[in-house]
């Protein structure tokens, strides 16, 4: 089995119309089984009231279909950066394919790249 014949789970941040989301996506033709996502930092959302990383979706997604995306609202742009403790967040992502082969990857995010984007988003 080659890597192109395997699930590929990614975790990313999205800014959309001054709102911030986390996206969990299987960007392959193959399902991902028992997906677990471990962030290096808490991600505080909903006006500073909720640790988004406490959601069950980070503990286990039993089946993530091919090209399936789960998009989680975090907060408004300004509130998100106001409550953000660290701008660098890593995600350790664990999952398996249907044959039981396990995969692990680390996805590194530097959220500083998003800090000035709101000015461009507002203009559109």
Indicate residue ranges for each PLM-predicted region.
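Short acidic, gly/pro-rich beta-turn/loop elements at beta-sheet edges
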Residues: 21, 32-34, 47, 82-84, ...
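Intrinsically disordered, low-complexity Pro/Gly/Ser/Thr-rich segments with frequent PxxP/GP/PP motifs
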Residues: 47-81
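Membrane-proximal alpha-helical anchors
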Residues: 1-33, 38-42, 124
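Glycine-rich loops and low-complexity Gly/Arg-rich segments
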Residues: 34-39, 47-50, 60-64, 96-100, ...
